[in-house]
């Protein structure tokens, strides 16, 4: 087996365009782009929240009671 050639990919692409139409493919591409953008934003937010200092990370001050 030699794999998928460029000619086969073009035929598959033409069949997909005929089945779904260009408008449907355009909206599908936009939806996919929005999903990827949202995923990247969520990953960035997770990275910044992991680097924030929490109260547990900061050493507490020593309190001395005078009797």
Curated annotation (Swiss-Prot):
This is Probable Sec-independent protein translocase protein TatE. It is a single-pass membrane protein. Belongs to the TatA/E family. TatE subfamily. It comes from the Bacteria. Its main location: membrane. One of its GO terms (cellular component) is TAT protein transport complex. Gene3D superfamilies: 1.20.5.3310. InterPro entries: TatA/B/E, TatA/E, TatE.
């Amino acid at each position: 087996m030699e794999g998928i050639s460029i000619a086969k990919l073009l035929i598959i692409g033409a069949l997909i365009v005929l089945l779904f139409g260009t408008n449907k493919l355009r909206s599908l591409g936009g939806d996919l782009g929005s999903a990827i953008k949202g995923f990247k934003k969520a990953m960035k937010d997770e990275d910044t929240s992991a680097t924030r200092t929490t109260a547990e990370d900061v050493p507490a001050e020593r309190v001395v009671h005078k009797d």
